[in-house]
Amino acid sequence: MKFLLFLSVALLLTSFIETEAGPVNEAGVERLFRALVGRGCPADCPNTCDSSNKCSPGFPG
C-alpha cells in the first residue's frame, strides 16, 4: 500500500513537472522515484539494479 502511495505521488509530480517545465529527464524521474520509495542501487551499478538492490545487467533501470 505504501508503495502505491509513493508511486501515485511520483506520477503526479512527474505530470506536474512535465506541464510546467517541458519534457522531463527520465533519469531524473527515476532517481526521484527511487529516493521516494527508498530503493537504492549499489554504487557499481546505479541504474541497473533489480528489486533486491543487486546489480542486474538485463534490468531496464
Swiss-Prot record:
Expressed by the venom duct. Contains 2 disulfide bonds. Residues 1-21 form the signal peptide. Disulfide bonds: none annotated. Residues 22-38 form a propeptide. Its main location: secreted. It comes from the Eukaryota. Transmembrane segments: none annotated. GO terms for molecular function: ion channel regulator activity; toxin activity. It is found in: Secreted. The keyword Chloroplast does not apply. Keywords: Amidation, Disulfide bond, Hydroxylation, Ion channel impairing toxin, Neurotoxin, Secreted, Signal, Toxin. The modification Proline amide is found at residue 60. The cysteine framework is XIV (C-C-C-C). Probable neurotoxin with unknown target. Possibly targets ion channels. This is Conotoxin Cal14.6.
